[in-house]
């Protein structure tokens, strides 16, 4: 997607894979790292509203396009992962952090297209969270812009 100039939205494992693809590293078991939170799912038998509900807050990096687009500086996210970003890959910059400092959202600084990845799952309980809807709207707008730009180049 990045090589072709396509808009990119990475969620959970996609967030981690973007980092790995650019030379970054992961904590394999975040919960075993001193001073890090347990980001894993708490109770897989709980109803969806609890299982995929808010787990911890994230603070957005000030004055980034992400903070400006969402119009907030922090919000709560679900958390269902055992791995997490240890070191950022080449050309990646953080957009949000968990209270323990773990990178929860990032983007590519060295490409021209829309790129956004996040550790949480905005596709769950989207109807209850206008910020999740805004994220998908931004991605949808980028996809439509890409399509329109490439249609105009057809013969």
Model-based region annotation:
Residues 26-30:
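Short hydrophobic/aromatic-enriched beta-strand-loop microsegments
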């Amino acid at each position: 997607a990045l090589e072709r100039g396509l808009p990119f939205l990475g969620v959970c494992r996609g967030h981690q894979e973007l980092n790995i693809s650019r030379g970054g590293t992961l904590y394999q078991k975040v919960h075993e790292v001193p001073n890090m939170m347990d980001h894993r799912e708490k109770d897989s038998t709980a109803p969806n509203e609890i299982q995929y509900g808010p787990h911890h807050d994230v603070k957005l990096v000030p004055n980034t396009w992400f903070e400006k687009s969402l119009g907030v500086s922090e919000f709560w996210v679900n958390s269902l992962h055992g791995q997490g970003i240890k070191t950022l890959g080449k050309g990646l910059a953080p957009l949000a952090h968990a209270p323990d400092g773990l990178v929860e959202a990032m983007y590519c600084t060295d490409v021209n297209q829309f790129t956004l990845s996040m550790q949480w799952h905005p596709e769950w309980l989207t109807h209850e969270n206008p910020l999740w809807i805004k994220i998908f709207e931004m991605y949808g707008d980028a996809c439509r812009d890409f399509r329109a730009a490439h249609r105009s180049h057809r013969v």
